[in-house]
Amino acid sequence: MAPRGSGRLEAVVFAVMVLFCSGTSTATTAAAPASSPGIQTSSPAPGTGSTRLPGTRASTQQLTMNCSAGGILYSVLGGPFALRCRLSRAPKANETLYAMLAPLPSNTMAAADRPHGSLSHLGNGRAPLSTIYRYNVTAKAGTLDPSAQRSGLAVAIDTESSGDPISFVIYSNMSTRAHIGEYIWRMHDAGGTTADYATIVLLARPPIAAKAPSTNFFLDADVASALVVEASGAYPPSTLTGAWFIDGNRSAESAGFATNVRQIITSDGEVDVKWFLINTKDSPPPSVTPQTTVTFVATWTPPKGFETVFPDGKVTLTKVLRPLWLRKPIVQVSRFPPGYLVCRASDILCDHGDLQWSAGGKIVKSEHQAARTRMHLGSKLCALVQILDIPEDTSLQQSVTYTCTLRGYERIYNWLNGTIELDNMPLRQGRPMLICLAVVMGLFVLGSFLAVVISACLWGSG
């Protein structure tokens, strides 16, 4: 039989053990490590609003933030976008909130590129974050931290704020139209715990304009001539297509033309697209007449996710061209007595081209100004005429070749010139040489006659 009071002693021992075990469990829970700075281990779905700061107990004094954007915010490169966030209470004296724009991990970035049709070889050439964005943060007593890391922007929030909405406005840089990537806008306190976040996708941009640098089409050029249309600023370029039409509704390929497209990527990441309508044949397509028109249609389709940014869907640019269909200019040189050479270049552009003379391989300058006249009334083509004085030379010498060259078309035609050869033999030496030749011939005839007469007299006397 147990001594009296032993039951009470066992109850006391049991109570002490329960208290000891309960204290150990509480201590273990309190010693759990806090979340790593800047990393949210248990992040909510985007756009769900406020989030409890990890490592803290639920309390009415807990600082939370709710951003109006939430979820994924799509925006256009070159345009501003804003995140407006409201704090649940004013931060305490020992609390500081920072707004940080941080890029996604590299593996996530690579995965995000593919759905938007980005170019793989641009992956390693992304512009640094500091050159992509220009920050304009409007907040009560907000200050821009110049020592912010290159991976993001840190903005200190005034500790005296009373919960009024705080706006963060970011402007993307126009010079990086083709930048690839997604970024997450985060709000976190000094301890690195995330309060709320929103994902921002800056990829899509419709073409700014479609323009044709020139509407001159040289049909029988020595190099393949082409009409060019440029569309600037469209991104991603894989969603931009173009088509050529002859006289409104006939495809260029069926009319005997070839087409080509080229993406021009500059050093700062811009992507411009050029389309070419090319005549690859030696002769002009039979369907071309002076009145033939060319229509170019560029269509840009917004990538998936940008439907709200571009509610009208596809963006279409139409360019109607009325080309000046040009044939190869003709250069002719002729002699005009008594001492002039005339060079005439026909079927040339009225504001383009000059004539250059050379004799025996050396450039000579004409004292006469070239004259331009239209081929016919209302024509857009002209004829260019220039006169060159040739000196009279009474001496006997070798022939000289005069060449008249049409300059200004070297990129289109290998050589445009006309030549004439002046033979300086006696018959082409001019009037003095003809007189001399007549005297010589007269003396020869007279001498021959005298020789015959003398021979006859001597023969008769014998």
Swiss-Prot record:
Subcellular location field: Virion membrane
Cytoplasmic side: 455-462
One GO cellular component term: virion membrane
Signal sequence, start to end: 1-23
Keyword annotations of the record: Glycoprotein, Membrane, Signal, Transmembrane, Transmembrane helix, Virion
Ranges annotated as biased composition (Polar residues): 39-57
The protein, known as: Envelope glycoprotein C
Protein species of origin: Psittacid herpesvirus 1 (isolate Amazon parrot/-/97-0001/1997) (PsHV-1)
